[in-house]
């Protein structure tokens, strides 16, 4: 016998599922050196869009570890130590490759250049040596920054957080001519005079960090399919490292 009590539930599901599917954001990635959606990319990949970056307050690489499975992150004086699935190392040749706009960052400090004005973040887990070469046995982190456009736009961000950390970031860009545009972003971070005391005599407060960075991108469309891109970037970091070693015998 047909039970009418199940009929309203069937109707409800038939309308609810398509509506939910329409709200899913489709992210196009370039992790395989070509454009494809996350669903069509045959790799263990996590993609974070610019909308999610803004909504969740992602400002640096440290914030990514809360969104990417199997990823961990530590930092000493701005030097990034990334591990994916437990693979990674902290020296001049890390086990996880970091690229900014497709440019390999060979040193740990260099990855800070891609933390500003992000358009998208792509994290590939597992060995990626075939496409990305050395330093990618653990995986790859692709930082894609915003490109210049003909529309004039910009923003200013100010922040203050725990341990007396202050941040400031500003970006501005637009068209220079009919086929040339630019985008400039500057960033500064300062973390007080330190937030903990070193017990050894003479070392005082530790944990101070001071960082200034900028990036200028210029794009010229030579034709409908060819463009010339120029990027100039710099980052300078000062601070006190995390103290380690034997404590002074002050008994």
Q: What do these predicted regions represent?
A:
Residues 153-155, 160-191, 195-242, 246:
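Transmembrane beta-barrel wall of Gram-negative outer-membrane proteins
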Residues 101-127:
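Short acidic/polar hinge/loop motifs at secondary-structure boundaries
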Residues 24-56, 80-81, 96, 121:
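N-terminal periplasmic "start-of-domain" segments of outer-membrane beta-barrel proteins
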Residues 61-64, 81-85, 99, 123, ...:
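N-terminal periplasmic accessory domains that precede
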Residues 30, 62-103, 119:
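Extracytoplasmic beta-strand/coil segments of soluble accessory domains associated
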Residues 45, 53, 64-65, 121-126, ...:
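Non-catalytic regulatory/gating segments with a bias toward low-complexity or hydrophobic composition
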Residues 248-251:
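Surface-exposed loop/turn segments flanking beta-strands in extracellular/periplasmic regions
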Residues 1-22:
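Cleavable N-terminal targeting peptides that direct proteins into the secretory/outer-membrane pathway or into
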């Amino acid at each position: 016998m047909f039970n009418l009590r199940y009929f309203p539930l069937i109707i409800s599901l038939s309308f609810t599922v398509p509506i939910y599917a329409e709200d899913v954001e489709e992210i196009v990635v370039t992790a395989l050196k070509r454009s494809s959606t996350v669903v069509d990319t045959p790799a263990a990949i996590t993609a974070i869009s610019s909308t999610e970056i803004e909504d969740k307050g992602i400002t640096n690489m440290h914030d990514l570890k809360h969104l990417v499975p199997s990823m961990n992150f530590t930092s000493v004086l701005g030097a990034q130590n990334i591990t994916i699935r437990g693979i990674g190392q902290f020296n001049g040749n890390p086990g996880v490759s970091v690229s900014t706009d497709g440019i390999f960052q060979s040193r740990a400090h260099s990855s800070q250049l891609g933390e500003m004005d992000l358009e998208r973040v792509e994290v590939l887990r597992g060995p990626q040596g075939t496409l990305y070469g050395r330093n990618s046995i653990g995986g790859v982190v692709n930082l894609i920054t915003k490109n210049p456009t003909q529309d004039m736009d910009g923003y200013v961000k100010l922040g203050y957080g725990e341990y007396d950390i202050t941040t400031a970031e500003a970006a501005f860009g637009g068209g220079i001519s009919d086929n040339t545009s630019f985008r400039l972003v500057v960033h500064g971070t300062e973390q007080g005079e330190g937030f903990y005391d070193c017990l050894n005599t003479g070392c005082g407060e530790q944990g101070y960090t001071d960082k200034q960075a900028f990036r200028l991108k210029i794009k010229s469309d030579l034709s409908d399919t060819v463009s010339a891109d120029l990027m100039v970037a710099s980052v300078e970091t000062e601070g006190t490292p995390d103290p380690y070693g034997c404590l002074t015998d002050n008994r």
